[in-house]
């Protein structure tokens, strides 16, 4: 496919996916994300041909022009839409599939691990039709499965299966294959705060058992069923918020 065909295809894709796009001419003239993607085609070709310094210099010029930083070594699929664009960073070994949507502030970066080296794959792979909300960070050599959605502000550090929605810091799955994923065990949410709360709860239970004759600390709820129902209602509210697009 020639460059003119790619430009025509990209403009048509943005016109269909962006409700703010009023005409093909407006998309062509006023879409910094598209400008960055089109420039990357040249930069990537130069990179593969061994003109790496030239490719890097040109990519820096485009970075100042569009606010989008795409390393010339990154591999981008067709019909990539970078909406708004400002602050998007795509690392050298990142791979982006077809029909992917990225919003402003998204980072496809490395973890900074000492095991990372110049010859290893350090950046994520996004499969086809992935949607990434603004200011989300996807870090390391991980894979985001096809048709998955990453919520705004999320930090993704592990693989995401296809057809999933992930939110949070670190990100956890809230939807999979169109079905809500119930988080009934706090151990399923892997983050330092949850670990600290779990350790604290275990410690309190141990101390109560050691005291023996002392009265256990009273709970706010009258019984476990009432407490469980209150937590379930709160989770339902959060899931409804996410299902309506909140945080995505």
Language-model segments: residues:
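Terminal amphipathic alpha-helical/low-complexity segments used for targeting or macromolecular assembly
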Residues: 1-61, 181-248
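Solvent-exposed, flexible loop/coil residues
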Residues: 32-33, 38-41, 74, 80, ...
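Structural signal for interior beta-strand "rungs" in well-ordered beta-sheet cores
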Residues: 63-174
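A structural signal for small-residue-enriched, beta-sheet-centric alpha/beta enzyme cores
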Residues: 172, 176-183
